[in-house]
Amino acid sequence: MKHGFARTMGFLMAAVLLLAMVLPAQAATTGKSGLFSYTLKGNGTASITGFDWSQYRDNENIFIPQMIDGYTVTEIGPSAFARGKGTLDTRFQDKTYFAKVIIPETVRKVDEKAFFNSGIGYFTIPASVKTIGTAAFCTGTLRSTTVDNNNENYASIDGSLYSKKDKELLALAVETTSIPNGIISIGEYSCINGLIELTKVKFPSSIEIIKNYAFNGIDSYGDGTIRFDHVKSVGDYAFASLRESGVTIYFGSTLSEIGRNAFSGARLKALHLEQCTKVTQIPWAAFADFSASEKTRLPSSITEIGGMAFANTLIHEFAFDHMKPITIGSRAFEETGGVLDVDDNFFSRVESIGEYAFRGACFTLNRNVHDIKDVITLPSSCTFIGKGAFDSKWTAFKVQPGSYAEEWAQENGYEYDNGTKAKADTSWLN
């Protein structure tokens, strides 16, 4: 037993000594030199992970070192130079938009959001850079990028940054007045630039994809028209939170997919979607808190209206001509702040209506009044109606005898008509 105890204690002491040797090595994997913070990678090279903006002199050029504390710099890490949160933040513009960042030839990778919202105006990118992450150079005030002509993967045209392989716009610069024909994708966050009036930028007919957050939160649209006649998909939050503008946006018949919150909070002059007959779904909050000066007509192909799709929207600015949705999500039209202009067949194919879907909404059913109860016909295909789906102040129902809708109306105390008349009691005549 004594020998076993001694052997165990020996193992424990060896483990403690080993930890004592390892811990200092681990602590040395991060460091700081001047304004730069860095982390050592497994191959013994360094990744820049942070920058001390509190010690930065306004509009001074930033030279990223080739070597830092004796280690070769091969990477600029995620959000290493990023500032603030969210989308465009004008607090940083006047301090950095004349500054230039020179990336050394040792760097092979610039990670996602590396310079996001930093306000930096100019970049020099060497041929050595093989990988650029999402929104890496979306600074909010990008003036120009210069990419070495020998770079195999990336290019700069009129100051804007592009991926050669993906034929994608990665960052739009203020010098750019047109995107070259052949570009098929507008990258995430790529057009967020507070120095640009986007209506003065010509987008080619070759564009097929608008990725997430591509135009999110822009307040420099100006007045004019932007056409995306051949776009097939619009990503999540792609046009969300656009500020007050006089812009009109057109989409053509090729559009088949609209992302979540795609136009939520946007303020436009007009949005044209009437030709988009391949679109079958309005996803979550796609038009929540949306506003346009002219009425937006949606295609008749829509079969699914997602949750919060039009919540808190001035709904009279939309036309639902001949639309026959099958599924209406929870809170889809909640507190729409106007009269919902639908035709008499709007509910003719509906199968499911989510909770609070029409709370606070009222209908015209092709009548220009809403001070009387509108009679909504619920078909026998309807097998689910969520809690508080309708505001009883404005609605009464026509239902099929023995249907789910009739049972629901009875249980919830709604006024309804099932098309039958009660048989008169004649027993007293006997």
Segments (PLM) and residue ranges:
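Bacterial N-terminal signal peptides that target proteins for export
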Residues: 1-12
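Structural signature of tandem-repeat unit edges
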Residues: 35, 39-45, 57-74, 86-109, ...
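Consensus positions within tandem repeat domains that build extended binding/scaffold surfaces
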Residues: 78-80, 112-114, 134-136, 188-189, ...
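Non-globular, low-complexity intrinsically disordered regions
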Residues: 49-50
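Bacterial N-terminal signal peptides
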Residues: 11-20
